[in-house]
A protein has these predicted regions:
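Catalytic activation segment of kinase domains across protein kinase-like and atypical kinase folds
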Residues: 26-67
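All-alpha amphipathic helical-bundle segments outside canonical DNA-binding/catalytic cores
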Residues: 97-109
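Active-site activation/catalytic loop segments of kinase-like enzymes and analogous catalytic loops
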Residues: 52-95, 111-130
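ATP-dependent phospho-/nucleotidyl transfer catalytic cores
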Residues: 1-20, 25-39, 129-134, 148
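ATP/Mg2+ or Mg2+-diphosphate-binding catalytic cores
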Residues: 115-183
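Conserved helix-loop functional segments at active or binding sites
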Residues: 1-8, 43, 61-64, 92, ...
Length: 183
């Protein structure tokens, strides 16, 4: 699937836009009183890229209610309800028909979680050169968190596909049906 996604990107079937580049939950400022997002912060990552990948990374972050550094790793799950409400809000503002790329959202969520799992693991194996750490096995722990999120996500793909369908986006049926065979 990674090769297929890269092929889609290389054939320019997905539009490039200005993206945030790191839309994790901790980079959102919230108005607590009115309960809405005021702004994205940490703008050093803004660049040209693919909106669907930024959206996938945002979903990766908001779906894990235990957080990036949970006290109890057992609580790491892909929370489909958080994603459902986020997508309803997102697509109530953003024109879902504007981009062909949204049909590949499950694949890109898979890709971003898988990529982070591997990046944290590689950094741990290479003596923690890239990501800042608080303790020696910090990146190994981060990799485990992402791996747990990935395995939970795989189980939730059919539900995610249904949620996308409910808001008018047909997801790529091949990926969803292939995942169902293995889960």
């Amino acid at each position: 699937y990674i090769y297929s996604l890269l092929l889609i990107l290389s054939k320019k079937k997905i539009d490039s836009n200005v993206i945030h580049g790191d839309p994790k939950l901790s980079n959102f400022l919230f108005d607590i009183q009115y309960k809405y997002v005021v702004s994205l912060i940490d703008l050093d990552t803004v660049s040209s890229g693919f909106c669907v990948i930024d959206l996938a990374d945002c979903i990766r972050s908001i779906s894990n209610l235990a957080g990036e550094e949970p006290e109890n790793i057992e609580k790491v799950v892909f929370d489909i309800n958080s994603v459902k409400y986020f997508l309803q809000g997102y697509f109530s503002i953003f024109n879902k028909n504007k981009s062909y790329s949204f049909r590949f959202l499950p694949e890109f969520i898979y890709l971003i979680i898988f990529e982070l799992t591997i990046r944290f693991l590689i950094d741990f194996l290479q003596s923690n050169r890239y990501f800042e750490i608080k303790y020696e096995t910090h990146n190994l722990f981060r990799s485990e968190v992402q791996y747990r999120l990935l395995t939970s996500f795989l189980v939730q793909i059919p539900k995610l596909s249904n949620e996308l369908h409910d808001i008018g986006i047909s997801s790529s049926s091949t990926f969803v049906s292939d995942v169902q065979k293995f889960v």
